[in-house]
Amino acid sequence: MNTTTLNFNSLMPLIMHSGRLADPLDPASQMLKKLTDKKKKTHSDHLEVSKCEWYGSLYVDDDGKPCLPGEVLEACLVEGARKFKLGKVAKGGLVVLGNFALQFNGPKTADELWENGGYLKRAGVRIGQQRIIRSRPIFPAWACSFEVMWDPGLITDEGQLFDIARSAGQSGIGDWRPKFGRFEVS
């Protein structure tokens, strides 16, 4: 396996949405369930629901700092490879391990980001026939550098890897793509 460093630099804001809230054993999911099970919610209940959704959607590393997980970056690259009809090749030929720091100007911890208020995106989403307001972390300008391992038996060369990454940048990463999460590669 060869290793190459890719740098993603934002063209559009990144909206995060981790799968934590789908896990019924996750503490954030349990807290959200308690709040949403209430029939009559107060204003402060709605604020707590928003906060729970936001924290549950944020990708953080072991130090509590925003990051992009390897599996998210890898899935993004696989999506980019599909433009060249190389989706299955990329699935078998690309590996991104670990969490990679999200680079941005602003507060660095989840609590500071929440308190700042500038990293909150509230928008209506369709669930079945209903429209419900959801809260997500948003990063207006961001970058991420990470290492990708690639199999030279499947990915021809580094040039093909960069073509795949540039294609991924047109599709974007995170929630509500391709409008959000678009990036350029260096």
What residue ranges belong to the model's regions?
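RNA-interacting cores
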Residues: 1-186
